[in-house]
């Protein structure tokens, strides 16, 4: 028990209780959609009566409660129950006079009365255990007390005999009452004769000291927040002091009976159906309850003190009690019984007991009550459960979040966002201000000591005048309540915003952007559509905020654009606006508003004080009234003038001073005590503000309370000075000179500011000061902006004074010990060179500078570096006249003082003097030469012209000279340098502007140019298809024309073919014929294979296979050869026209000095001219020969199977062709638009020139083949070209390069121009000879003696039909004509090995692999692979072919 009572002041919370509380909260959690269920309420805890510390005599047990048995009839009416309770209380008080009885302390003055009981034997609400009435007078018999005890025992037995039923099946009130009865049964045993040693109840922690209540830290929130005095808006009752007596002497006749109040209380049958109705119903209950409390206090003031009970604050701080009370509140009427009003008068009795002497009876009762003050847990339940006139279960009440305790009501201060204030209830007010006047008004005015206490109060009030001043000055913010206590709260809520606004003027814009939703509705739209009542200030506030945000946003944009200066221009001066009548009227209204406010405060204070005086006088006894009266009399009407002196000399309280007390000087009177300061209007400060600072001259008048509204004051100089300092509210004055109103603040001063103070630099002034001349910055000045004036140099004292090294007064000692520094030149710097001495400008020295130089040399002992640094000006730009180098200073000093005789003879100084003399002589010689030359020019000019002679410019010397005044041209040089720099910058700027203009123009032009639409792949495919269709159409037309011409020519020559074939097939022909090959198989001359009769088999000509296997045709002019483009059908045919193909001989031996075959030799313009001339002649000859042809033989078409047979027979050719032909045949595209065929030598023997010419003429080959001769500016597509060299037999060369190389070898000393001219002549001769040969070859070809049968190597697309004119014979490769441009040519990596197959411009020419040997391929037999490479060529040269065909 000792350990349990030791913690009486702590909050009761154990693990079991926390578990029950958590279970209850989870079951009624409104956030989970659950409603309040009373069945989840845990059982209430009962609190035991602490053990008795001092028990003298065992007395009759005082019952703590009077329960009603559920088996008996309903309880009696209210008056009867009240009378019985009074008797029980009286008997208990009588026993307390003689002995100390430990009893539970009462909570309520009046016990609760049980109402009518229902027929189902439900327990009625009963009194809480531990509630007892104690009276100071015994007027009740003892048997009634015994009867009450017997009834208590019966009620306990009946209660215990009831069967246990589930809580869900019982009525909430029934369950609650049974829990209470159970607790009561445990608390008070029925067979115990006395309460001397009671048993503990549920281990309740009690107070260890008598008279000290158990404090609970937290007051539980009431579920019905406004149903009683202990709602969440009402603070917990203030605990009484341990030393305060809890009882007082009150006569029994002054005890107020609750009959009159209870008679007016009726049970409310209203049941709310909506949450709003529930809130309004609770608010009405709260208002009515407060009205009853106030009326009860007023009634108690007239009947005497109402405190014979004390409220103990050790109420359980649990939600269980609150929920039980909430459940029991369903049977409570809207108007509570007087038990809930009684605590309000309790503190007054506690305070009153301090000043009243206790009688023996009162002391005995006080001791009985102050032993222990405990309250049973059913106290609040008893308050809430009153008698119910209507039996039966009450209708269910709507459960809301407020009623269930999930949320609580907010006070008006919380809703308005004001600083939280501790509410002062009427219960706490006597504790907060404990004044004797309060106790006098509480009902002790009948005491004989009241007047004396009133006089003591005056002295106490005089002491209160030492508080801080509460004078309110104009233009001063009204101090809010509790300034000192609420500083932290304000700092947390609003000080941060104010701090941000002071530091950053853009804070308003930031808040507007931060709290305004980006896509939400603006505040303006919300205000325009608001459903609440809005004033003009609300709209103006939003308008002002919008205007500020617009201004700040503009400022923010200008700041980012570097266009917002920190200092703004001052507003332009405008004439002041003349004041109008409206301004005067507004000024009158302002000061009248202040006057009326202050006057109203004064009237309120005066009326309150007068009312308090009247109340005090009425409630006082006759003796006190005599002390309160003012000794005055009504002056007679005949002598009104006598009142003045009498009132002037009389010392009276301020209550009688009806006139102005300030006009009469008399001593400070004793002020009449006024009422409490809490009832003053809210506009006036209730208490002295501790936040106000001391005034300049603190005086008593500034520390008066609010109730002291009049006082007397001596008109001393100090008082007059104080009054003069007070603000005076007067209307605007009219200036006598201008007859205009003289305003304190101009009408436009509020908005017409000079500049907007957006930063600290806005209103600040920049002070300029005269700086000292710039000085040379020392190497020890580390700061860039440091100046000597701000940090003056302070000479530090030496650390050691016993060192005489740097002290000037010890210099003579140093000179004796150590000889002075000897004379020396500035040897640390090299001696000036002779060139510098000749070209330097003389330095100028004034007399003052010479003297300074002497003094420095003497002071620093020939330290020329230090002397130079002292004499060098501080400017960074040093002119020649101001040059002060160490050697310059030494030279000047030597010129003034002269060198010592011993030093001038040394070799060092001799060299120095010699260098200076030599430089001087050279300078003089140069000046003399320039002067002589100028004179000669003048003489020549005078002889020829009468021009004026130019003045001779004499150059000054190079040695330092003395001047009286040095003319400084440094500023001129600086200006010139600045001008040049500015001009340079302007030039650069102009160039940049010009470039930017050009760029802008170019950009505009480029933007205006229409861009071609971006074609899709489908568009490209469509264009390609259309182009191919056009090419096929043109090719088909051209093919039909060529077929018709061939048929006509073949038909015309049919009669001449047999004779020519006999001449060509003869084995014993002239040497110019092709040698006979005995190994060749016999060939018939018929056209069995589809060949025309005019074309014979090449094997019959005596040549192996007729032509080498690798001989191909390069298609240069498609309209001549009749080549077809890709994708179209091709009739492989060849015209027997002699001009259709020309064969060009190739030398059997290549010369080492000849150009490589794959290199172009047309680098010089002469070669190009020769090539163009040759191409022109060839074109003329070709046209002439084509026109002379009478007819052509038709060419039959070949079938695709024959083409396949031809391909299969190709690799089966005998190897003798490789042995016979060892040259490198190449077909080169020519600009003459006809194919060229390079014919190698046969079997290493030189070919006959006549035969080669015949072959060339018969094959339609033109010679010489040249690059870059394509018409219409189309370059030669192929990088490889055949470069046939000169024949070993001396045949005519066929290329310009070979002709030139041959001429240069024969004539090495011949100039290049002659070589070119001779080359051109030989070329013309060659062309004439070839023209003659062509006519002969044409005749032979027409006769069929020379069968030049090309092999058309077909592609594998099936559209190309080759010609098989001979079985096993060589094929001439003809590619497909592709429609590619030469620009789309892709270089092949294998051009050396594959020219005709992989996209080479040679278009299918079979090219042998080049030999790796140094031996020319033309001299090696069997080294050439004659096999052709199948495949269609993708040469870009076919584009030019298609163009030619289209032409």
From Swiss-Prot:
Residues 231-247, 925-940, 1180-1230 have a biased composition (Low complexity). Residues 332-342, 428-438 have a biased composition (Basic and acidic residues). Residues 841-899 form the Myb-like domain. SMART domains: HSA, SANT. Residues 569-644 form the HSA domain. Keywords: Activator, Chromatin regulator, DNA damage, DNA repair, Nucleus, Transcription, Transcription regulation. Residues 60-271, 300-443, 636-689, 923-970, 1003-1023, 1180-1248, 1381-1447 are annotated as: Disordered. GO terms for molecular function: chromatin binding. Residues 150-173, 219-230, 305-323, 353-369, 379-389, 1231-1248, 1408-1447 have a biased composition (Polar residues). It holds the Pfam family Myb_DNA-bind_6. One of its GO terms (cellular component) is nucleus. Gene3D superfamilies: Homeodomain-like. GO terms for biological process: chromatin organization; DNA repair. Component of the NuA4 histone acetyltransferase complex which is involved in transcriptional activation of selected genes principally by acetylation of nucleosomal histone H4 and H2A. The NuA4 complex is also involved in DNA repair. Component of the NuA4 histone acetyltransferase complex. This is Chromatin modification-related protein eaf1. The lineage of its organism: Eukaryota, Fungi, Dikarya, Ascomycota, Pezizomycotina.
